[in-house]
C-alpha cells in the first residue's frame, strides 16, 4: 500500500502547474469482520478499501476532493487527474482563505506496527469454549489500517498498524445485558479469556433482584469503559484552542485558572505508541501533548487554522482539535481491592447517552443502564435499576475523586463509519466519594 501511495504522490507532482501547491492524504484498510449472535458466527467477510484526499492550493485559496481508489494504478491516476482539473476550475470561484496556513517543512515520518494478529481458528474455538452456552452478540474486527500524507513541499508520512477489536454483549433471559470489549495490538488468549469470564460473572449478578435507589449522592466506582464515556465528552471541544478562544469549551474555567481538578488527574495526548499516525490530517507532525498535569491545565490542541486565527503556535492537532489518543495517568488503587475500597456504593461498568447539562460548569448527565451493581460491604448485591446521573467534572475528577486504578485499559474506537478508526484512549477506573443520581 505504501508503494501505491508513493506512486500517487509522484503522479500528482507531475501534473502540477506553476504556482500550485498540493497535499495528498491517504487512508486504507484490509479488515476482517465477523458478526456473532448466540455466540455463533452469523456473518463473516473482508473489506479492502483505499481513498485519497487531494487538496489544491493557489493564490491564497484552497479546495479539496476525496477520491476512491481502485488499486489499479492507471485508473487511479486518471481519477486523480480528473479531481485535480475539477479543483483547478473551482479555485477561482472561491474567496481568499484568511486562515490558510500550510506546513512548508519537508518532514518525514514512518511507522510500521506489524504485531501478529490472531487467526480466526484461534479466536472462534476460545469463544465457543467460554461463551458457547450464552446469548453473546458482538463483532470482531481485525487487520492493518494505513494512513499517509504528502505535500508538494516534500513532506511525507506513512503509518501502518495492525489491531483487533472484539466488542460484545451478553444477554440475560430478563432482557438485561453486560457489555464488554477486548481490543489492542498484542493478542493474548489469556487476557481475552479473563475478559469473557468477567463478563459471565457479571451476567450472573444480573439475575438477582434489582435494587432501586432513591435520588441522592452515592460512593461509586467507574470502570474504564465508563470513564471512556466521560473522557469522550471532554473530546467535544474540551481541549480545543478554537473552543477555548471562543468560550465554548467545557474546560473553560480550568484553562482560565478559575478551577482545578484533583492532583491525581493528568491527561495527555499520547500519540507515540498509539494506533494514530504521528501526523495530522492537515499535514503537520504530531507530538505528545500534556493537556492537564496534576489537575491543572497545561497545553491545548491547536490546529493550523486556529494558530493563524488566534496567533498561537500549532502543535499538530487535526481540524477538529479533538484528542486521537487520550491517556489518563494511573493511580494507586489495585484492581483486586476495588470492591473492598468501594465498601458500599455503585459499581458502574458503563455509562450511556451522555450529554452536557451545563457546559460552562462541565456538568454532564447520562444513564447507568445495565451492569451497574449495588455493593454493600465489598460484596455485589444485585443490579441497580436504570438511573440518571447529573454531576460536574470538577466533582467527579476533582473534589470527589478518591483514587484511580493502577491498571489501565486500552480502549480502541469501535467506529467503522466509512472506515475503521485509529482513535484510542488509555484509561484507569475511578473511585469517587460521591456521584449524584437525580432520577
Where are these regions (language model features)?
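Dual-mode signal for accessory low-complexity, basic/Gly-rich regions
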Residues: 254-439
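Active-site bordering "gate/hinge" segments
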Residues: 1-277, 284-287, 293-296, 379, ...
Amino acid at each position: 500500500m505504501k508503494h501505491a501511495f508513493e506512486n500517487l504522490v509522484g503522479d500528482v507532482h507531475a501534473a502540477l502547474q506553476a504556482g500550485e501547491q498540493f497535499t495528498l492524504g491517504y487512508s486504507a484498510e484490509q479488515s476482517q469482520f465477523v458478526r456473532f449472535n448466540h455466540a455463533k458466527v452469523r456473518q463473516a467477510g473482508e473489506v479492502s478499501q483505499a481513498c485519497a484526499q487531494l487538496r489544491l492550493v493557489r493564490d491564497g485559496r484552497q479546495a479539496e476532493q476525496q477520491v476512491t481508489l481502485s488499486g489499479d494504478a492507471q485508473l487511479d491516476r486518471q481519477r486523480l487527474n480528473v479531481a485535480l482539473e475539477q479543483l483547478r476550475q473551482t479555485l477561482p470561484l472561491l474567496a481568499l482563505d484568511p486562515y490558510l496556513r500550510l506546513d512548508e517543512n519537508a518532514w518525514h515520518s514512518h511507522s510500521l506496527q506489524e504485531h501478529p494478529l490472531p487467526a480466526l481458528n484461534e479466536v472462534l474455538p476460545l469463544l465457543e469454549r467460554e461463551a458457547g452456552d450464552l446469548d453473546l452478540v458482538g463483532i470482531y474486527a481485525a487487520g492493518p489500517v494505513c494512513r499517509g500524507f504528502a505535500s508538494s513541499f516534500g513532506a511525507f508520512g506513512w503509518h501502518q498498524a495492525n489491531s483487533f477489536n472484539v466488542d460484545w454483549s451478553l444477554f440475560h433471559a430478563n432482557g438485561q445485558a453486560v457489555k464488554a470489549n477486548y481490543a489492542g495490538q498484542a493478542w493474548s488468549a489469556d487476557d481475552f479469556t479473563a475478559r469473557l469470564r468477567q463478563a459471565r460473572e457479571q451476567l450472573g449478578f444480573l439475575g438477582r433482584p434489582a435494587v432501586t435507589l432513591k435520588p441522592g449522592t452515592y460512593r461509586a466506582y467507574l470502570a474504564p469503559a465508563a470513564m471512556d464515556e466521560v473522557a469522550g465528552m471532554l473530546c467535544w471541544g474540551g481541549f480545543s484552542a478554537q473552543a477555548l478562544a471562543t468560550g465554548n469549551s467545557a474546560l473553560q474555567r480550568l484553562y482560565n485558572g478559575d478551577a482545578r481538578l484533583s492532583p491525581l488527574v493528568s491527561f495527555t495526548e499520547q500519540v507515540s505508541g498509539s494506533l494514530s499516525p504521528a501526523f495530522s490530517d492537515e499535514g503537520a507532525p504530531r507530538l505528545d501533548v500534556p493537556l492537564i498535569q496534576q489537575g491543572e491545565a497545561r497545553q491545548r490542541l491547536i490546529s493550523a487554522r486556529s494558530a493563524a486565527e488566534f496567533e498561537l503556535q500549532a502543535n499538530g492537532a487535526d481540524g477538529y482539535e479533538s484528542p486521537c489518543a487520550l491517556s489518563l495517568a494511573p493511580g494507586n488503587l489495585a484492581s483486586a481491592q476495588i470492591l473492598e475500597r468501594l465498601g458500599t456504593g455503585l459499581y458502574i461498568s458503563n455509562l450511556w447517552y451522555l450529554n452536557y447539562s451545563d457546559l460552562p460548569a462541565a456538568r454532564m448527565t447520562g444513564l447507568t443502564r445495565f451492569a451497574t451493581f449495588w455493593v454493600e460491604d465489598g460484596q455485589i448485591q444485585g443490579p441497580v435499576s436504570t438511573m440518571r446521573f447529573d454531576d460536574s467534572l470538577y466533582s467527579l475528577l476533582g473534589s470527589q475523586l478518591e483514587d484511580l486504578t493502577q491498571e489501565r485499559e486500552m480502549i480502541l474506537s469501535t467506529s467503522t463509519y466509512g472506515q475503521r478508526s485509529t482513535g484510542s484512549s488509555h484509561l484507569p477506573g475511578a473511585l469517587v466519594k460521591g456521584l449524584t443520581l437525580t432520577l
